[in-house]
Amino acid sequence: MMRNLPPITKNLLIINLICWLASIVFERYGVDLNHYLGLHYITASDFYFWQPFTYMFMHAGFTHMFFNMFAVMMFGPALEEHWGSKRFLIYYLITGLGEEIVQECVWALQLQPVLASLDPVMASKLANRVVTIGASGAVFGILLAFGWLFPDVRMFIMFIPIPIRARTLVIIYALIELFAGLAPSSSDNVAHFAHLGGMIFGCILILWWQYGDRFKNKWRDLFRPRHPRIKRDDDSVDYRDYHYHEPL
């Protein structure tokens, strides 16, 4: 099966698997890779510049990694065939960064007031304990793109005996994440709004790819110098370069 996968999809699966295995090996030696490569709140002392990229390749366990990579393997090849490898990789990374940006905003709204009420030592300890890992934002972005580009593809989902259109599936997942984010349970440690961030940035990127050139052309036309147009009665030829000569 791996042989038939396009290159970026295959390499994403391999990299995520290697990172998960590395986290297990390092944990046996007392090193928590998820802490160093996972995403921290931007004001935390353990936040590093590489974390917005590395966090999306780390996972909390086999199940977390398996289901994310299963989704990449299911939907990624169709997108990579449609867009090409370069554009698919850009999309994957941008949606992953979209998850990171939204999660940082959520922390700023929810965590920052708590940190401000604590003494500096306790605030620093709490900030460093909050970590986000996983490729779920990129996966939700991939799901959105598949439903956008192939809306009428029918899919079977576990525990649902009838096929569902890809577009409908995207809407269902988005609503589930939205409601779960608005009314989280006390034991819920899933970054639901961050998942929606992957979808939002995926939507923006797809719209830019589809309509960006048209927008840029219209924007350039606003500032392009206008030339005089002169029309004769017998036709509508554009005489922008017509030269007038005084009679001798």
Label every PLM stretch briefly:
Residues L17-L33:
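Alpha-helical transmembrane segments of multi-pass membrane proteins
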Residues Y29-D32, F150-I160, Y211-R220:
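Juxtamembrane/interfacial segments flanking transmembrane helices
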